[in-house]
Swiss-Prot record:
Organism: Phaeodactylum tricornutum (strain CCAP 1055/1)
Signal sequence extent: none
Assembly notes: Interacts with alternative squalene epoxidase PHATRDRAFT_45494.
Topology versus the membrane: Single-pass membrane protein
Lineage: Eukaryota, Sar, Stramenopiles, Ochrophyta, Bacillariophyta
Family note: Belongs to the cytochrome b5 family.
InterPro entries the UniProt entry points to: Cyt_B5-like_heme/steroid-bd, Cyt_B5-like_heme/steroid_sf, Cyt_B5_heme-BS, Cytochrome_b5
Subcellular location: Endoplasmic reticulum membrane
GO MF term set: heme binding; metal ion binding
GO cellular component term of the entry, any: endoplasmic reticulum membrane
Family annotation (Gene3D superfamilies): Cytochrome b5-like heme/steroid binding domain
Protein name, entry field: Cytochrome b5
Residue ranges occupied by any Cytochrome b5 heme-binding domain in the UniProt entry: 4-86
Parts of the chain that traverse the membrane: 108-128
Length: 133
């Protein structure tokens, strides 16, 4: 298949099984999102097939980058390139909404942690004060 072919999310999201496993990896800073058919690599992946199947049919760039793959792994990935990820208006809107929801979810956890930390500090300070008397 030509690396020039473009795929939309609806097409990519149909490839989520051991028979056909596609991933979107990449961003604007490294040549744009690309589509990879990693089906033949599932059994050879050091982290196991399940890791890739968990993010199959979707944007897996964050997961790929968080792992810190080696230069060799990045070079190997090029063997599975099938095309470019074409972001249409509907997909872009969905991706933005998902990113905002994820950021909001992340921030809500931070607020709770801060409250718990402050409460623990107040309890520890109160205990310290009673012991000093």
């Amino acid at each position: 298949m030509s690396a020039e072919k473009e795929y939309i999310l609806d097409e990519i999201s149909q490839h989520t099984t051991t028979e056909s496993c596609w991933l979107i990896i990449g961003n604007a800073s490294n040549g744009g999102p690309k589509v990879y058919d990693v089906t033949k690599y599932l059994d050879d992946h050091p982290g196991g097939a399940e890791v890739m199947l968990d993010v199959a049919g979707q944007d897996a760039d964050e997961f790929f980058e968080d792992i810190g793959h080696s230069k060799e792994a990045r070079a190997e990935l090029k063997n599975y390139l099938v095309g470019n990820f074409k972001i249409d208006a509907a997909t872009l809107a969905k991706m933005k909404a998902d990113a905002e929801a994820k950021a909001q979810q992340k921030n809500s956890g931070t607020g709770i942690m801060l409250i718990v930390l402050m409460a623990l500090f107040a309890i520890a300070y109160g205990y310290y004060q009673t012991q000093m008397k």
